[in-house]
Amino acid sequence: MELITKKMQMLERKCEAVNQITFDEDFNVPDVKPDIGRMIQKKGEIQIEDIQISQGKAFLSGALMVSLLYVSDSEERKIYSLRGNLPLGETMNLEGLENGDKVQLKWDIEDLSVQLIHSRKINIKALVTFTAYVEEVRQLELPIGVEDGEISQKKQDCSVMCTAVHKKDIMRVKEDIDLSSNKPDIYELLWNTVEIRGLDIRAETDKIGVKGELFLFALYRGNDDTNSLQWLEHSVPFYQEMECQGCSADMIPNVEIAMPQSDLKVKQDDDGEERILGVDAVLELEMKLYEEEELSLLTDVYTPVRDCRAVRENYKLESLLVKNFSKCKVNDRVKVENSQGKILQICHSDGTVKVDSTQIVENGILVEGIVQVRILYIIGDDEMPFYSMETMIPFSHVIEAESITENCVYHLRADLEQLSTTMIDSDEIEVKIVMNLNAVVFRQTDTDIIQRIEEQELDREKLRSMPGIVGYQVQPGDSLWDIAKKFYTTIAVSYTHLTLPTKL
C-alpha cells in the first residue's frame, strides 16, 4: 500500500565537542618598543587560520592575539601599544565527523590576564573555550494519506516546524570617518575597539535585512607640536540586505552574527593629510529560517476486507510555541579602586554580554549572566593621565514564554544594545546597560510516524468466532474509529448524525 507523503527538512546536530585551552606564556617586548612602566588596558581575540578535518577529528590552528596599551618607563612617560601572538593548535574529537562535513566553530575568551614580570617581559594567561559542531539537514517524509481510496484513514491536524533555509554568508561594513576640525592630524594610532550594537534581523522576500551599528573608539597621538593624545568615539549605523533565496517575511529567523575581523586604518584626505579613519568590519552570518506548516497527519488506517498493520517510527516533531524579543535593563554604580587620583573624565567604555545559565521556569526562561565592562578614564596627572578599570555587572531576566515546559527547546541570542557610563563623583561611576535577549521557543512532541503499511489476508477463523450482532456500551475516550476497527466494520456516521467520527 503506497503512502502519500509530504517531504520536510529538519536540521539535526550530527556531533558536538567542547574543549578548553589554557595559555600561560611569557612574551618579550619587541626591540622597537620602549620599556613598560605601567599597563593601562588589555584585550584579546582569537584568529582561526585553518580547520583540518579527518575521520572523527578536527584540528584547529590559529593564534590568540593579545594587545596591550601601556605607559613607557622613560622620563617622557609616553603611551604606547604592543601586540603579541600566541599560537594555538588543538584537536577536537567529534564522533561521526567525516570528510566533507562543515564544522561550525565558536569560542569564548573566559579569562585573560597580563602580568608585568619586568619592563621588557610580560606573562600572558588565558582560558579559551571552543565549541565545535556539525549540523546536517535530514529529509523527513510525513504521511498525509494513502493512494487506495477504499481504505479508511484516521488523520490528526498538527503544526510542524521545518527548516526552510540553512546557509552561511559574509557581509562587510565599511565607513570612512573624518576627524572634526578641532582635532589635529593623526601621527600614530595607538588603540582602538570596534563593537556591534543594536542588532535587528528581519526576514523578507528572498533576503535577510540586517540592521545595527558599529561603535568604535580610537586613541591616537596627534601630529602637533607636543604629539598630544587625542581620542574619539563614533557610531556607524548600517543596514544591509543579504540575498537568501526561498526566504519569506512569515518565516522565523534564527541568525547568529559574529565579527571575526575588524580593522581600523589611517587614511589621507584630499589634501594629503592623515585625517581619515577607515573602519572595515567582517561579519559572519549563520542563517537558519524556520517555516511552520499545517498538516493532516495520517495516524492510522484500516479496511474490513484486509488486515492492515502500520509500521511506525518515533520522531520528535517541533511546532512554534512563542518568539519573544525582549530587552533587559541594568543600572549599577561601581567604585573606582586603585586609582592614583580623582577621575576627571571618562574616555570610553565597552562591554560584552556573557550568559552563564538558562533555566525553564513557569511561563518563561530565566537567563542569568554578567556584562563585562571596561572603562578608560583620565585623572588629574598630566604625566600619567590614562587609567583603566574592569568590572562585572550581573543581570537576571525572565523572557516570557507562556505554557513553556521542560519538553520545549529554545534558541537564545544575547547582545548589547546600549552602554553608557557617567561620573557620579570623582571616584564613583554609574553604568547603564540595555541588552537584547531574544528567544524562539519550539514545543517538542514525541510522535509515532507511519513508515509503511503492511497488508495481510484477514484471519477468517477470528471473524467466524465473532458474534453476528454486538451491543457495545461506549466507554470514556472511545471513538467510532476504534470501535469500527475492533469489530471489522465501518463508521456509520450518517445513521448516528455525528459530524466527527473520531469523537463520541
Where are these regions (language model features)?
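Viral structural modules
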Residues: 1-495
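Conserved small/polar residues in nucleotide/adenosyl-binding loops
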Residues: 496-502
